């Protein structure tokens, strides 16, 4: 099994699941036990500033205007739990280095740093995550539910949320609408 860590999963057009339809998921972990990822293209309608106020992390949070300023739905698993995908800046509590250029943090201290001089340069705040049990993701890939591509910082941090699925499909180099959703058919 080849690990898909640091890859994007792109939902096939035939995936009509209301939660994952046209989703792009960054795979944080993928091993023999399963996989874990964060959906990167579904804002939930709340700004990071509002979240910081609700969590009482800042009384008057600075306006955070980067693309990471909206809170995203990361996935259906533990939607009350926050995850921050970010460029390395400092080491916060509960930080995991995913690559040399990307970390995942689940502690409140990284949220407190947002809008300050110690904030990561680029970040995504998400609630919940997408998870797969042992061999589940491999089965879904075999069923043509997902396509995968290597992750890029540009798609992760510099592309508007609503454009991420289209940009990801364009990076495949072919028209995704021409693919069959049936295994073994082109």
UniProtKB/Swiss-Prot annotation:
> What Pfam families has UniProt attached to this entry?
DUF179 (PF02622)
Protein's name according to its UniProt entry: UPF0301 protein Ssed_1237
Instruction: Give the signal sequence positions.
Output: none
Give the source's domain of life in one word.
Bacteria
InterPro entries listed in its UniProt record: AlgH-like
Q: Which cysteines are joined by disulfide bonds?
A: none
**Any one GO CC term of the record:** cytosol
PANTHER family reported in the protein's UniProt record? UNCHARACTERIZED PROTEIN YQGE (PTHR30327), UPF0301 PROTEIN YQGE (PTHR30327:SF1)
Family note: Belongs to the UPF0301 (AlgH) family.
Origin organism of this chain? Shewanella sediminis (strain HAW-EB3)
């Amino acid at each position: 099994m080849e690990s898909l860590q640091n890859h994007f999963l792109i939902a096939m057009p035939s995936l009509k699941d209301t939660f994952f339809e046209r989703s792009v998921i960054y795979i944080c972990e993928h091993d023999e036990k399963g996989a874990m990822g964060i959906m990167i293209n579904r804002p939930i309608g709340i700004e990071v500033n509002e979240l910081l106020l609700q969590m009482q992390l800042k009384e008057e949070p600075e306006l955070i205007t980067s693309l990471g300023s909206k809170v995203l739905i990361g996935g259906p698993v533990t939607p009350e739990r926050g995850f921050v995908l970010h460029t390395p800046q400092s080491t916060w509590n509960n930080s995991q280095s995913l690559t040399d250029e990307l970390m995942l943090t689940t502690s409140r201290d990284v949220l407190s740093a947002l809008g300050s001089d110690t904030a990561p340069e680029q970040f995504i705040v998400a609630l919940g995550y997408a998870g797969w049990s042992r061999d589940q993701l491999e089965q879904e890939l075999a069923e043509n539910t997902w396509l995968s591509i290597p992750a890029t910082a540009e798609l992760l941090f510099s592309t508007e949320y609503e454009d991420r699925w289209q940009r990801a499909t364009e990076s495949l180099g072919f028209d995704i609408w021409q693919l069959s959703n049936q295994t073994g058919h082109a």
